[in-house]
């Protein structure tokens, strides 16, 4: 829907503080097909999560990068003609990417894009918990609630919250209980249970921080009810209503605000998003520490599609149809 593969797109031209990346693998997100189908202006390149090798280095980026370095990160796919990840080449600001160690595959590296960046913004910037710095923080007397912990975003939220020293409470389907515990959850509850709020509040009555990694239907209300005794903030990944409780606020967060530019969806009538300097600073800090912190923030499970653009299109169709579970879809470019 809404897009096509083009083979006559020029290689992006970089500025002095950018690097040119030859893409080796990408990861797929629901935001990709939403941009393709509805949001993106004509001529923009879709795709956010990438891994690859540095092909060219801007004059001001030479102290950090050299040609041939392995690199990964996230870009604002679906807004620009030369920055989307679903391309053979993309350009990115040199401090908004991370160096991939030799023991991490391209497909695993590609998963540290939108899902991981969103988790960093929510856990470290908005909720103010300690950033990763190569070692786990000392335990703190604080518990955080993460709704939908088995999602790609949820698994990164769990890991970053644990790395910050928190006790992590989450929800999932029973078949995913072991998965979320493997990634660090201290307690997990069946989100389908009609008494899930009562069960959580009984065991953890004093939470004030929540993140809704589903953000549809009743999920945000569940988060609010879990923290309403003490009051606090629920962070959502999509707009999902307004809080019914005066001591609970909702905060919509999107990974794109970490990329340092204002943007608007469906102009002139769509919502505008202003520059958030603290978000960009957070991403620089996160990606700088990530290569030394991969024993703490581990890659999430992946499902590999066929290589190349056909694999991307088929994967987006699966996401569009709600046919993906158990891992993040990834696609390789070129040889395995």
Task: Describe the predicted segments one by one.
Residues 1-15, 22-57, 62-336:
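Terminal helix/beta-alpha structural elements that buttress the NAD(P)+-binding lobe
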